[in-house]
Curated annotation (Swiss-Prot):
The lineage of its organism: Eukaryota, Metazoa, Chordata, Craniata, Vertebrata. InterPro entries: HMG_box_dom, HMG_box_dom_sf, SRY, SRY-related_HMG-box_TF-like. GO terms for cellular component: cytoplasm; nuclear speck; nucleus. Belongs to the SRY family. Residues 189-204 have a biased composition (Basic and acidic residues). One of its GO terms (molecular function) is RNA polymerase II cis-regulatory region sequence-specific DNA binding. Coiled coil: none annotated. One of its GO terms (biological process) is cell differentiation. It comes from Eubalaena australis. Residues 30-52, 169-204 are annotated as: Disordered. Transcriptional regulator that controls a genetic switch in male development. It is necessary and sufficient for initiating male sex determination by directing the development of supporting cell precursors (pre-Sertoli cells) as Sertoli rather than granulosa cells. Involved in different aspects of gene regulation including promoter activation or repression. Binds to the DNA consensus sequence 5'-[AT]AACAA[AT]-3'. SRY HMG box recognizes DNA by partial intercalation in the minor groove and promotes DNA bending. Also involved in pre-mRNA splicing. Residues 175-187 have a biased composition (Polar residues). This is Sex-determining region Y protein.
Length: 204
């Protein structure tokens, strides 16, 4: 079907109305890093739709490292975040129990406030994305191909069901494509004499 386009659809008034309607879309993605909550609202049926994801209360180390991280970053602008974290962890271990005590008390106070504000709070860790399975290394592929070749050449050492199918497949393949002397060299020692006599009878 074809739709007849009206020239008024592209007028400034219609374009302004469409832009206002687009701004009223229900989808909203907003993250507040400064507060204690992370809000993520979408117009679909997402798990976080219309719900607030509450952060865990800070522990003593986080309380202490907030100002220390900012201080170290200002003093060392070239230092990466991972290096700053390692340094803060080392400095925290070097503090005495008396120096850590004020931060433990502050963390306990924040935990009590968090409990009163969110009485039904339960910690729900985020699920990590599953990593794709690694491909087999070259050594493993070579080993698998070698085992397949040995199974083709020496099928008599495996189970009876697999041996019969493999042996018949090998005999039909060798009888059509391989000469007699090569096939006799590929067979095990215990079956070489019977195969040679069978070939000799065919020639005579």
């Amino acid at each position: 079907m074809f739709r007849i386009v009206n020239g008024e659809d592209y007028s400034p008034a219609v374009q302004q109305r469409n832009s206002l309607d687009f701004g009223k879309a229900p989808s909203l993605l907003w993250t507040d890093n400064g507060g204690s909550n992370d809000r993520c609202e979408t117009g679909g049926n997402g798990r976080e739709s219309g719900q607030d994801r509450v952060k865990r209360p800070m522990n003593a180390f986080i309380v202490w490292s907030r100002d220390q991280r900012r201080k170290v970053a200002l003093e060392n602008p070239q230092m990466q975040n991972s290096e700053i974290s390692k340094r803060l962890g080392y400095d925290w271990k070097m503090l005495t129990e008396a120096e850590k005590q004020p931060f433990f008390e502050e963390a306990q106070r924040l935990r009590a406030m968090h409990r009163n504000k969110y009485p039904g709070y339960k910690y729900r860790p985020r699920r990590k994305a599953e990593r794709p399975q690694k491909l087999l290394p070259a050594d493993s592929s070579v080993l698998c191909s070698r085992m397949h070749i040995e199974e083709t050449l020496y099928p008599f050492t495996y189970k009876d069901g697999c041996a019969k199918a493999t042996r018949s497949r090998m005999e039909s393949r060798l009888s059509h494509s391989q000469p007699t002397n090569i096939t006799s060299s590929l067979l095990p020692q215990e079956h070489r004499s019977s195969w040679t006599s069978l070939s000799h009878d065919r020639v005579t």
